Swiss-Prot record:
InterPro entries xrefs: SOD-like_Cu/Zn_dom_sf (IPR036423), SOD_Cu/Zn_/chaperone (IPR024134), SOD_Cu/Zn_BS (IPR018152), SOD_Cu_Zn_dom (IPR001424)
Keywords assigned: Antioxidant, Copper, Disulfide bond, Metal-binding, Oxidoreductase, Zinc
Family the UniProt entry places it in: Belongs to the Cu-Zn superoxide dismutase family.
Protein name (database record): Probable superoxide dismutase [Cu-Zn] 6
The protein's Enzyme Commission number: 1.15.1.1
Phylogenetic placement of the source organism: Eukaryota, Amoebozoa, Evosea, Eumycetozoa, Dictyostelia
Residues bound to Zn(2+): 62, 70, 79, 82
Residues that coordinate or bind Cu cation: 45, 47, 62, 119
Disulfide bonds: 56-145
BP GO terms, sorted: removal of superoxide radicals
CDD domains reported for this sequence: Cu-Zn_Superoxide_Dismutase (cd00305)
Record's function text: Destroys radicals which are normally produced within the cells and which are toxic to biological systems.
Record field: catalytic activity: 2 superoxide + 2 H(+) = H2O2 + O2
């Protein structure tokens, strides 16, 4: 069993997210809460670098070691870092409960040490007609982020 934690920080945005995985090849469970968001849907992704030295910008692009197009968490063709959308209620709080079978805390494509990012807008899963739909889901600005750390 491997467990990790992410302390999300941003301008008015904060939260705590945990990741747990029994063994390599088993599903990963991602749970937590993020507050300070505008009500509605927000894209959530793991980005390639574990670097928040310049806020969330220094985290790089979506984590995509298999060089696939952006997609939804249910798509076979997707970035490993594509976690879809979280929904903030009218109080600005989003509760996260995700089971994912692509992402891993084990092996060569582990997300450990990388940055989880919450975006200002809804992820269009690569289905929009925007220039950044196929690469970033047209999810908007990075409003909060934190490094995935082993616990």
């Amino acid at each position: 069993m491997v467990n990790a934690i992410v302390i999300i920080k941003g301008l008015g945005v904060e939260g705590k997210v945990t990741l747990s995985q029994e063994c390599e090849g088993s599903p990963i469970y991602i749970n937590g809460t993020v507050s300070g968001l505008t009500p509605g849907q927000h894209g959530m992704h793991v980005h390639e670098f574990g670097d928040t030295s310049n806020g969330c910008i220094s985290a790089g692009d979506h984590y995509n070691p298999l060089h696939r197009e952006h997609g939804s968490p249910l798509d076979v063709e997707r970035h490993i870092g594509d976690l879809g959308n979280i929904k903030a209620l009218s109080n600005g709080v989003a509760t996260i409960s995700i089971r994912d079978t692509i992402m891993s805390l084990f092996g060569d494509i582990s997300v450990m040490g990388r940055t989880m990012v919450i975006h200002s807008d809804r992820d269009d899963y690569g289905r929009g007609n925007f220039p950044d739909s196929k690469t970033a889901g047209h999810s908007g600005k990075r409003v909060g982020c934190g490094i995935i750390a082993k616990i």
